[in-house]
Amino acid sequence: MDRVADALERLRIISSERFRPTMELAWPRIVTGFAIMSKQTADLAMVGMAVGIAGTGGMAFALAYWEIVTMLGLGLAGGTVSLVSQNYGGEETERASLVVTQSVLLATAIALPLVATFLLFSEPLIAVFDSDPALVEHGSTYLVYVAPAVLFELLNLIASRTYTGVGDTFTEMVARAGGAVLNVVLSAVFIFAFDMGVAGAGLGTTLSTGFVTVVLAWGMVGRSYGRLGMEPSPVPITRSGPWLDLGLAKQLVEISAPEIGRRLAQGITVFPLLWIAAAFGPVVVTAVEVGRRVRSLINSINWGLGLAASSLVGQQLGADDEDEAGAYGTEIVRLSVVIYVAAASVVVVFAEPIAGLFVSGPEEVVQAAAFVAVGAISAVGFGLDGTAAGALLGAGDTRLPFVASLVGRYVFALPAAALGFVTPLDVAGLYLAFLLETYVPGGINYWLFRRGRWKAVSRKYRPSAESG
């Protein structure tokens, strides 16, 4: 690690004294992100082997709705990590604990209607994309079985971001990685041993996600994990209360709402993209989803570096050190781009064998490999976007990143995808959309960070603002 730190410092990417705390926070989150993203990726591959294109196509449609759940949770948890890190960094632990309590209550209020919607309206939700009976059957079945996991996943995201905000990414890594392994094992048993198909994938996800909730809840109420090496939360949820602080709740909503909007703008884009892909047939639908899943695995790097940027920038601002906060943000962005370029290069080289893990026919492999390669290249834009937006989030500056997300995805990416209908671009319009949806918001958010307006925004959220 020391040699790597020294080499990166000589290359003027990141100083060694900032690299160490960054990676101490980031590497467990990267493992966590990879574990979380690998669940649906492994499920998609197993369904492809057991059921075929109809199964993967229907599951692709269902996973679009699951992505909305994830984006809602990430947006809300973005407000959590921003306020927890600033208050914890300013030694206001009781106030940070109250942020967590209110985040849990809000997450539950959001989750319950979504659970009911998945259970009651699964078939109409899938039919939005395609009326093919086989696709609708497989997609709606997955939604029904995965519905209870909606509540579990939102609570898990709040717990994970709480641990990140206080500088502990090891505890959530152990819980999340254990849940991911359990998910793969359960899904494999249900899909292959019990011949449950997509239902087995959904059931495996629900049971494993619930397991993670139980594990994290133990520490979130301040209980010790014994000799496991995991730590109880230093800002625990308590029964004694208080349960509500209107001023703090307003700040949580104020920071989270634009971040939820930014995340939803990112997640909702997949709906018209899949609708356009459906016009080219189930092979293209599956190829798009394979490309997105592989890109999401690469983007697990952002789970670590993006959250490290939020936490470290937030903690430095909580201590009223704006210069150090700026230095952390700038250098983490540079580090992210370097790592993403390296990871994307490897995936592009091995795009065809990677595609072969999900599909088997020659035409299917060629199409999926193209989307795997394009997805890998577009992931570099995610690296820029995630760390720049993460640094802004640590300061509580979430409104303009939300606008950047809208512009990139709805002004650039979707029109590019639609060009396939009216020009000879055909499927290449979807390739272009993959690239624009990450590089445009990434470039805008990096420019916003370089402007420095976020420093002024952060001053009204710091503990010193309350006492002042």
Question: PLM ranges: what are they?
Answer:
Residues T70, L74, T141, Y145-T164, ...:
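Short runs within selected transmembrane alpha-helices of multi-pass transporters and secretion channels
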Residues T56-A116, E153-E172, V285-S345, V349, ...:
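Small-residue-rich hydrophobic transmembrane alpha-helices
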Residues V47-E67, A134-G139, V198-L203, L248-I255, ...:
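Interfacial/gating helices of multi-pass transporter permease domains
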Residues I13-A50, A64-G79, L83, T108-V115, ...:
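N-terminal transmembrane alpha-helices
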Residues R29, G33, L44-A45, L63, ...:
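Transmembrane alpha-helix boundary and packing residues in multipass membrane permease domains
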Residues E24-L44, S208-V212, L216, M220, ...:
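Transmembrane helical elements of multi-pass membrane transporters/channels
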Residues M1-A26, V84-A149, A193-S256, V313-S378, ...:
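Short alpha-helical transmembrane segments in multi-pass integral membrane proteins
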Residues S38, A50-I53, N87-G90, G165-V166, ...:
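Helix-loop interface residues and adjacent transmembrane-helix termini in multi-pass membrane transporters
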